[in-house]
Design a protein with these regions (language model features):
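Alpha-helical linker/hinge and terminal dimerization helices associated
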Residues: 1-5
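Hydrophobic residues within well-ordered alpha-helices
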Residues: 14, 55-56, 106, 149-155
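Ligand-binding cleft/hinge of the Venus flytrap
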Residues: 29-35, 59, 104, 121-134
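Secondary-structure junction motif
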Residues: 95-96, 110-131
């Protein structure tokens, strides 16, 4: 991968999903580049499934993605960190007095999530199915940043990583929705 694996030069190509990059990898890359300044880094932005396919095809050296992920052959996975999604709303759909809404009530609101074929979509499809509900979307996004932007524009409710949502909540741009 890198000059004789000595980390004295060369390039590392990493397939990374958006959330994995923002929650985990950026902090690690900062430290890595300080320790190994002569190693070039090439990041390719993918959904989890696309990153795994890029790895299978030899287009990247390794992948850092969110779960769920389906690996085949001799691929291995290692959990590096965890995060928690919360339900968020823009001002139009914020709940008065932190009202708790039931999962079934989400069908009464426009709902935004990642497009079919993404790990996030698969995760929430299973989550709703496990709760005897259908995962019905009003809007599909290609990235989690698009989910955030659509929620901020009062287009509906959406799940978003709590760690990334907190700064927008503190500024009053979005609001957490308590879900039962």
């Amino acid at each position: 991968i890198i000059k004789s694996k000595s980390l004295s030069g060369g390039t590392i190509c990493i397939g990374v999903s958006e959330i994995a990059l923002r929650i985990f990898l950026l902090k690690k890359l900062e430290k890595f580049t300080e320790l190994f300044p002569d190693v070039k880094i090439k990041l390719t932005n993918h959904s989890t499934n696309q990153a795994v396919n890029a790895l299978k095809a030899g287009l990247v050296d390794f992948a850092v993605v969110t779960t769920p992920v389906n690996l085949t052959g001799d691929m291995k996975s290692e959990s590096l960190c965890s995060f928690h999604d919360i339900l968020i709303a823009g001002p139009k759909y914020s709940q008065p007095d932190n009202k708790i809404i039931h999962l079934e009530e989400l069908q009464d609101y426009p709902f935004i999530s990642m497009a079919e074929g993404t790990g996030t979509h698969d995760h929430y499809t299973k989550f709703f199915y496990d709760n005897n509900l259908h995962f019905n979307l009003d809007m599909e996004a290609s990235t989690t940043d698009q989910v955030l932007a659509m929620v901020q524009a009062n287009l509906g409710l959406g799940f978003y990583p709590e760690e990334l949502a907190s700064e927008y909540i503190m500024r009053g741009e979005i609001f957490p929705v308590n879900l039962y």
